[in-house]
Amino acid sequence: MKKIIGFILLLTISFNSFSQANEEDINALSIFSEYVKAKNYDAAFQPWMELRQRSPKFNSAIYVYGERILKHKIKNSTAEEKENFINDLLKLWEEKRENFPSKTPLGDILAKSAQLQYDYK
């Protein structure tokens, strides 16, 4: 009987913690997506980066909007920062390929990577 009660208690706690984490992810996605829709990419960067690091498989919008955010950062940054953002964009495309392979053809990623490296060599 104690094992059953303990098991039920453990399940309840784990479901509760999972739903809280999921709510945080939903809120972060909502926050940065609204900033991106308003083209306020600088404000969107921090919540986007937190969600990308915490839950990379949560939603493909992390990668779609992330590409816009990083392209904005590349255009509006110094030479030092630009190189870091370019490398981050290349990494973002690889992460998208790993986490959402059905939505990311390899040819598209390779073509985008080559074009980006050519444009900013």
Pin down the residues of each PLM region:
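N-terminal leader/linker segments that initiate helical-solenoid repeat arrays
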Residues: 18-87, 91, 102-108
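Positively charged n-region of N-terminal signal peptides that target proteins for export
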Residues: 1-4, 19
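Extended amphipathic alpha-helical interaction segments
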Residues: 109-121
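Sec-dependent N-terminal signal peptides
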Residues: 4-13
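Short, intrinsically disordered, charge-balanced linker/junction segments flanking boundaries
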Residues: 15-19, 120-121
